[in-house]
Design a protein with these regions (language model features):
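Predominantly soluble domains enriched in secretory-pathway, periplasmic, or organellar proteins
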Residues: 2-19, 26-387
Length: 387
């Protein structure tokens, strides 16, 4: 079984050298690290998929944006290239690359724009879908990771890893309009991750992924630092009682029926290893189910009608499918290191990213048939699909 350290070693072999340095609707991390010390990068590996698992940053300049972004195209954050790659999933061709700030890690498509969390530069880059030459940089704090769009309010919520805050961006103004600070202490007064994942004590909640309640008004924030789920009342801008979470959270979703939260986490070492997808009651926060997936659950997706769920086991390298009753219906080996999972708007196509191998796999969701593998991406992190 791969540990954090052996996984990082494999990454170094695959990449040739290592750069310290990782999701849909409400996008979660693949989170990036600004510039931590070497031991900090190792510690965050277990919690966020290995920010020290990156190949060297490419020195190649992005091509000038050209044609409008057509429905069905993929937008992929290339962490090591500081670009947003636009990809045709059917041919695997990289059509263009757009400068997207330092260490882009998360991507979200909303309201005619592609939003990219530039985790190394404290900004969100907005790219106009109709005219990709229109690019706006929005300053949002220290390290934006989780992205979530509130269509009713016209607001983009941005989780700030190092500031333990949620920033609110007006998507019409393309400007920061408010910041909500999370409480210093989390669930049961936690202030730190477990020993497996701790670098510096008391470093804050460290939000990595967001999900919006379907009725609006409540934002769920999966936190690495206190391995819990903060709940923010958006009407008051105050945090209410937190839920217990998962060690090394990577993604949080509200279930299709609105009754549950689906929480994916990669865990740590020893007793902190995580091989199950956690299902929480959305009202009480009680963990009602632990669904076996495989070592280090790095992502989750659900069909819009709740009829199917998919999850990925990063260290086992498998995509796993379940029915509505959590019966396993299939597994597809894709290779160790898969760390991003997105269901396309068509509900029929899954995109699975491997930031170490520089790949995005295109998979038929109903059958788990591998349709295509896109190569040549520079540490692909967040993935979004133009609707």
């Amino acid at each position: 079984m791969l540990t954090r350290r052996t996984f990082a070693s494999l990454a170094g072999l695959a990449a040739g050298s290592v750069l310290l340095g990782v999701l849909p609707g409400c996008a979660g991390p693949d989170a990036g690290q600004t510039a931590p010390a070497a031991n900090e990068g190792e510690g965050l590996n277990s919690g966020e998929g290995g920010k020290d698992e990156m190949p060297p940053t490419s020195e190649s300049a992005p091509a000038a944006p050209s044609a409008a972004l057509s429905p069905g195209l993929l937008c992929v954050a290339e962490y090591a290239n500081n670009t947003l790659a636009v990809v045709d999933p059917s041919t695997g061709e990289i059509l263009q690359r757009i400068a997207a700030g330092q260490n882009p890690a998360t991507v979200l498509v909303a309201d005619g724009w592609v939003y990219v969390g530039s985790s190394g530069g404290g900004e969100v880059t907005a790219v106009n879908i109709a005219d990709p030459s229109q690019v706006t940089s929005i300053t949002v704090g220290k390290q934006p990771l989780g992205l979530c769009y509130d269509e009713a309010q016209g607001v983009l919520y941005v989780g700030d890893y190092f500031a333990s805050s949620i920033h609110l961006v007006d998507t019409q103004l393309k400007s920061l309009v408010k910041t909500v600070k999370l409480n210093a202490q989390g669930y049961h007064n936690r202030t730190d991750p477990p020993d497996c994942c701790r670098i510096d004590p008391g470093t804050g909640r460290r939000t990595v992924a967001l999900a919006l309640a379907p009725e609006g008004g409540l934002l769920y924030c999966a936190n690495y630092g206190t391995f819990d789920v903060a709940r923010v009342d958006l009407a008051t801008g105050e945090e209410i009682e937190a839920f217990d979470g998962v060690v090394g959270p990577r993604q949080i979703l509200v279930s299709a029926d609105g009754a549950q939260l689906l929480l994916a986490g990669v865990g740590g070492e020893g007793e902190q290893q995580v091989s199950d997808l956690y299902v929480l009651d959305r009202s009480s926060g009680k963990r009602v189910q632990e669904v076996p997936v495989g070592q280090s659950v790095a992502g989750v997706a659900q069909a819009s009608d709740g009829s199917a769920v998919w999850a990925i086991a990063r260290d086992d390298g498998e995509l796993v499918a379940f029915d509505a009753n959590w019966n396993e219906t299939g597994r597809l080996p894709l290779g160790v290191g898969i760390d991003t999972l997105v269901l396309a708007p068509d509900g029929e196509t899954l995109l699975v990213g491997n930031s170490i191998g520089g790949q995005v796999h295109v998979v038929d969701a109903p059958s788990l048939a591998l349709l295509n593998t896109i190569e040549g991406l520079a540490s692909p992190k967040g993935i979004a699909v133009i609707a």
